[in-house]
């Protein structure tokens, strides 16, 4: 099977010779496609794959190993190309041996040069020392290549301790430039060194020979004397006689000096007693000194004295010392109890706690005082948190309402929180948000907000020291050096056992903090069993969205401070869950309050119309929503580690429904405004743009609004809401990352269009019905009969009255909104044309004059309102004309044209409004 690539070919290696472990660079062709493709690399028969580093298809770097062959090829094997070949070779040099006393830049493995096992416990032969310069003359290293020397002296060595030593090689390598005279001197030195080595041991033996003989003679004489005395039977041997003599001499001496020795012993005893009192005054005074130093608080002095006494008298058997040492131990036990009591006192600083723990550690107090301190601090923190809640609840019962605790603005540790609150509070909410509010509102903190502020400050004042105390307990810095060394194993065991317990303590503090905040702000999220302990707040009113945002920022800063202590995230996750719930609650409350404020916008409607036929209501509505969303920006935005408030589908749906309800509340306000009785609306003036040249007439300030005018104003507002406001609000929702925007827009638009259509139909009914109703009466006024009538002299008055009424509608609509004119007039004309068609179709027959009169009036009306005709009205006019007989002669057509021109000329001024340029007819 042929391979996909050519076999590797090594064409170069640098360097091409060296000792084992020399780093070489191999170059060639097809050396592999990657590190995993390289499966073999041998140099001089030694596998170097472990040290190989594949650089590219033409380069590999490795180290030469301990090969057996002095010279060999470089073979590369790859998966893709198989076993390769080499055009170059590498020569492996033997490493130069370094003498015992020679300086070397690398660490020398002496076991490779000397066999220490064979040299142990015996003299070192002279040759094993291998002097660095056996000839005794200056060494000058040869500059000839080692390779040439090896070729010249094949199989030989320059090492003079080697079996294949070559003197010529040695001289060429070390003394190539040495003169012959110096070499002769070197031979003399070499002979002298050899003689010294052979004569040294002989001289040592000769010098001590007489001493050896004298020692031998003495030992022989002693041996002979002992053997001779051993045969005698008088008073035993010589040693027994010597013992008797010595005993008699001792007894005689005691008798002579008994009195003197007695006095000496008594003096020595007295002197020793005084020395003991002076020497051990430290121990005898120590119990009293311990009491005094404890009273002064010099615990370090007491501990040092105790350690000294313990080392001197801890294991004494002297009764006096044991008595006084027992008193010392009793005083130290009292000190242990005192220090433990001070350690467990609360409140206490971290410095004092560490100091007392170190004292107790030095005194080898039983148990684990450091852990007892941690437990006491934990209970104290929980008690402070509960007391904080009870204190605020008592304050709330004693000082309800306006007497709320004030925020300490000057001493607050978190100015950014108050800055955020001030920035949020300063948002202008339009006219509807300014009533009944003064500048002092931001300094009146609700009780529950003040409670959260104080609670978080309390936790941040206690927990850092609590955490640092645990860290010191873990790393052993609480204990002294001696205590750390003596109890290190036991303490490590305790730390492993205490880790889970401490984790539970931290979690208990976190749970208590979160539940207390939930009890104050989110009581519905507590379990039934926790409600009494953590809840119980008398909530008179729901917190505003701004205060909730302030609380969220406070808790966020608390979380950041706890994270800075390097507390594990799993212990702080419960705070993140609380922040998420508060963010969702803040959004809900803000949107609900926004809906309430928008509901009150109807009370602020002033009915002042601008040039576009709009009041300030749509703008106020948009501003209200925009300011609400701006106040929620910091709440909706996610801080590091926080989840999105819209991650849960349930939350998305609730927020979407609240947004829809806000839009529908405003739509309901518009409907209420359109149907409100005249007496309930203050419309003492109506302001319009009187500068428009198309205005039919000026409206004075004392003009009262009618129900039809209110309908028109609301319709104009509806049109603006549909084209601009609702779309702008959708963009603001999207900008603030709200979800379900399409649904909000669709539902809101549908409700708005429904209201618009209903109000439009009401207005058309109010305006079109009277005009339509007057047509039939006007046509048949004066017993007019289509079968028997005079030749037409012009358009009759009923049609002129209808046109005047239509002009009045035009004027009324134009006064409010120019854009509504085509839509309203088109529907009115549809109704009029439909009625006119019906009346014409009901006539059984027309006379020649009657047909001409009817055609004149229908054409006059149609031509007058031509710019407002719709397909429906054109169809009605067509049906009306089709119901008439055709004109009999050209004279009738001429008469019809003359009468039409006369009508248009006589009513030119009145019909001007129908001739003005008009936008495309709007929807009906």
Swiss-Prot record:
<keyword id="KW-0813">Transport</keyword>
<dbReference type="Pfam" id="PF15469">
    <property type="entry name" value="Sec5"/>
</dbReference>
<keyword id="KW-0268">Exocytosis</keyword>
<dbReference type="InterPro" id="IPR039481">
    <property type="entry name" value="EXOC2/Sec5_N_dom"/>
</dbReference>
<feature type="modified residue" description="N6-acetyllysine">
    <location>
        <position position="454"/>
    </location>
</feature>
<protein>
    <recommendedName>
        <fullName>Exocyst complex component 2</fullName>
    </recommendedName>
</protein>
<keyword id="KW-0175">Coiled coil</keyword>
<feature type="domain" description="IPT/TIG">
    <location>
        <begin position="8"/>
        <end position="93"/>
    </location>
</feature>
<comment type="function">
    <text>Component of the exocyst complex involved in the docking of exocytic vesicles with fusion sites on the plasma membrane.</text>
</comment>
<dbReference type="GO" id="GO:0031267">
    <property type="term" value="F:small GTPase binding"/>
</dbReference>
<dbReference type="Pfam" id="PF01833">
    <property type="entry name" value="TIG"/>
</dbReference>
<dbReference type="GO" id="GO:0000145">
    <property type="term" value="C:exocyst"/>
</dbReference>
<keyword id="KW-0653">Protein transport</keyword>
<dbReference type="InterPro" id="IPR013783">
    <property type="entry name" value="Ig-like_fold"/>
</dbReference>
<dbReference type="GO" id="GO:0015031">
    <property type="term" value="P:protein transport"/>
</dbReference>
<feature type="modified residue" description="Phosphoserine">
    <location>
        <position position="432"/>
    </location>
</feature>
<feature type="coiled-coil region">
    <location>
        <begin position="240"/>
        <end position="260"/>
    </location>
</feature>
<dbReference type="InterPro" id="IPR002909">
    <property type="entry name" value="IPT_dom"/>
</dbReference>
<dbReference type="GO" id="GO:0006887">
    <property type="term" value="P:exocytosis"/>
</dbReference>
<dbReference type="GO" id="GO:0006904">
    <property type="term" value="P:vesicle docking involved in exocytosis"/>
</dbReference>
<feature type="modified residue" description="Phosphothreonine">
    <location>
        <position position="440"/>
    </location>
</feature>
<dbReference type="GO" id="GO:0006893">
    <property type="term" value="P:Golgi to plasma membrane transport"/>
</dbReference>
<feature type="modified residue" description="Phosphoserine">
    <location>
        <position position="435"/>
    </location>
</feature>
<dbReference type="InterPro" id="IPR014756">
    <property type="entry name" value="Ig_E-set"/>
</dbReference>
<comment type="similarity">
    <text>Belongs to the SEC5 family.</text>
</comment>
<keyword id="KW-0007">Acetylation</keyword>
<dbReference type="GO" id="GO:2000535">
    <property type="term" value="P:regulation of entry of bacterium into host cell"/>
</dbReference>
<dbReference type="GO" id="GO:0090543">
    <property type="term" value="C:Flemming body"/>
</dbReference>
<feature type="modified residue" description="Phosphoserine">
    <location>
        <position position="431"/>
    </location>
</feature>
<comment type="subunit">
    <text>The exocyst complex is composed of EXOC1, EXOC2, EXOC3, EXOC4, EXOC5, EXOC6, EXOC7 and EXOC8. Interacts with EXOC3L1. Interacts with GNEFR/DELGEF; this interaction occurs only in the presence of magnesium or manganese and is stimulated by dCTP or GTP. Interacts with RALA and RALB. Interacts with ARL13B; regulates ARL13B localization to the cilium membrane.</text>
</comment>
<dbReference type="GO" id="GO:0019901">
    <property type="term" value="F:protein kinase binding"/>
</dbReference>
<dbReference type="InterPro" id="IPR029175">
    <property type="entry name" value="EXOC2/Sec5"/>
</dbReference>
<keyword id="KW-0597">Phosphoprotein</keyword>
